[in-house]
Amino acid sequence: MKINLDRTSSGFCIGVQGTIHVAEEKLAAKETLFSLGDVVHNEVEVKRLENLGLTTIDEAVFKELQNTSVLIRAHGEPPETYATAERNKLDITDTTCPVVSKLQRTARLLCQLGYQVIIYGKHTHPEVIGINGHCSNRAVIIKHADLSDPEELKTLDTTIKTALISQTTMDVPGFYELKTNLEKRFAESDETAGKPWTAIRDIDITAAMTGIGTMPRTVFKDTICRQVSSRNKKLHDFALANSCVIFVAGRKSSNGQVLFGICRSANPRSYFIEDIEDLEDSWFRDNEGSPVESIGICGATSTPMWLLEKVAEFIDGRFNHRDA
């Protein structure tokens, strides 16, 4: 039984790497450190950091803190979080992912330009909450690219200037499906808005802000992180190349759900686990009861490499040694 560990398209993305590195440095220096929300959407990694001294808090506790240090994770936060920190004299360690920071700025400027902002994303995801905060909490958040949820469309106004952006970890095909469906929806109410929406760049937004340029009524900006989305094809091929796949991620990980779906579509014998306790012996046998030829082990952008290695070592020790 060959065990293949994916080291090229699994493990922490750059944004999460930065957050974990900063947290480890501060904890190693024995500093008191609170994290506003789970530092990463992986319970195993959160527990490891909490064992080093990190304390995870929710928003209610955060608002009561005074004169201490708080870590802002890679997902980012809305402006009101920083206002609270200033009032309470909190020392903020801001590890917002640079890609997310750029997206927050884009959302803020689009709102200032008078655009209705649509965010392709998950309503309760912390990144989306942060982006919406930069739109004064007035953005239209749409998770279903087919526009199948009427609740998501209640505040959508098809008669005004509109800009479409995305949570950084959403799927690229879904984003463009949503764009197409919005074009159709807007065309139903106004034929002049029925033409394809215009892709915009940072320079277009800057020109509009300074008054030296203008932007069309309906625009979109693909803000999906390519370091994340580029993993899709690689994981698809990785899943195809193995007899079965063990996908390691936290249940809360949005990116994990997307990537696992890709693995499962490529290889039906793909299994989602958080840690080794979730493994089942039957997964590693073919229909005749013999060991499968190969096992692929991979994970999300919020899955630490040490955990993937732990899973690989456990499977190797349990099945290869037992079958020898």
Curated annotation (Swiss-Prot):
Reaction catalysis annotation: isopentenyl diphosphate + 2 oxidized [2Fe-2S]-[ferredoxin] + H2O = (2E)-4-hydroxy-3-methylbut-2-enyl diphosphate + 2 reduced [2Fe-2S]-[ferredoxin] + 2 H(+); dimethylallyl diphosphate + 2 oxidized [2Fe-2S]-[ferredoxin] + H2O = (2E)-4-hydroxy-3-methylbut-2-enyl diphosphate + 2 reduced [2Fe-2S]-[ferredoxin] + 2 H(+)
Q: Which residues bind dimethylallyl diphosphate?
A: 41, 75, 125, 253-255, 302
A single MF term (Gene Ontology): 4 iron, 4 sulfur cluster binding
So what EC number does this one have?
1.17.7.4
Residues annotated as binding (2E)-4-hydroxy-3-methylbut-2-enyl diphosphate are 41, 75, 125, 168, 253-255, 302
Record pathway: Isoprenoid biosynthesis; dimethylallyl diphosphate biosynthesis; dimethylallyl diphosphate from (2E)-4-hydroxy-3-methylbutenyl diphosphate: step 1/1; Isoprenoid biosynthesis; isopentenyl diphosphate biosynthesis via DXP pathway; isopentenyl diphosphate from 1-deoxy-D-xylulose 5-phosphate: step 6/6
Report residues binding [4Fe-4S] cluster: 13, 97, 225
Q: Which cofactor does it need?
A: [4Fe-4S] cluster
Note on cofactor: Binds 1 [4Fe-4S] cluster per subunit.
Indicate which residues the UniProt annotation says bind isopentenyl diphosphate. Answer: 41, 75, 125, 253-255, 302
| HAMAP family from the UniProt entry | IspH
| Function per UniProt | Catalyzes the conversion of 1-hydroxy-2-methyl-2-(E)-butenyl 4-diphosphate (HMBPP) into a mixture of isopentenyl diphosphate (IPP) and dimethylallyl diphosphate (DMAPP). Acts in the terminal step of the DOXP/MEP pathway for isoprenoid precursor biosynthesis.
Family as reported in the entry's similarity comment: Belongs to the IspH family.
The name this protein carries in UniProt is: 4-hydroxy-3-methylbut-2-enyl diphosphate reductase
Q: Which organism is it from?
A: Chlorobium limicola (strain DSM 245 / NBRC 103803 / 6330)
